[in-house]
Amino acid sequence: DEIFPTYKTRIMEIGFGMGEATAILAKEFPETAFLGVEVHRPGVGKLCASLEAIESANVRILHNDVIDVINEQLADNSLDGVHIFFPDPWQKKRHIKRRLLTPEFLKLIHPKLKVGGFIHIATDWVPYAEFALKSFAQVSALYEGSEVERPSWRPITRFEGQGLNKDHRVTDMRFIMK
């Protein structure tokens, strides 16, 4: 409420990369507040420049780790939704522990969502989609949802384009807080 006092709908964009999808959504949905969280400094700078160019006032950016943001900066029942578009799949077996969409993460973000709040994920890495679906299955008392068709409102990101050029199948998933 402190950073978005006049917006009724609040969406957190986790790992917005270079920010192209966030900027497009901010322009297309000016009545929605977007909180972008990113650790990659060049992406933060690129999104700032994009937002200035479109004169957007409905985005706030945190250059921080999302776990720290959730633990230290987000109030409970403060988010209407979370977007996680093309997270790093951490493909190597020894790196799987770094994946974001674990049952522990899903439990951590759950109280920050309003009743009926959602998490929308898109990935072009089938093993990561399977991993995410298994993680949600492990916390089925908290969320309900599944794989969905790509929504028309979701912009195609640079990472998605790269995946499509490699003939990767893009999977969208949407889960609603119970």
Annotate each language-model stretch with its function:
Residues 115-123:
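Conserved beta-strand signature within the Rossmann-like core of class I S-adenosyl-L-methionine
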Residues 40:
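Conserved SAM/SAH-binding beta-strand->alpha-helix loop
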Residues 48-76:
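S-adenosyl-L-methionine
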Residues 13:
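Class I SAM-dependent methyltransferase core
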Residues 19-23:
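Glycine-rich SAM-binding Motif I of class I
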Residues 101-115:
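A short glycine-rich, Lys/Arg-flanked "PGG" loop and its adjoining helix->strand segment in the class I
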Residues 44-46, 129:
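Short alpha-helix immediately C-terminal to the canonical SAM-binding loop
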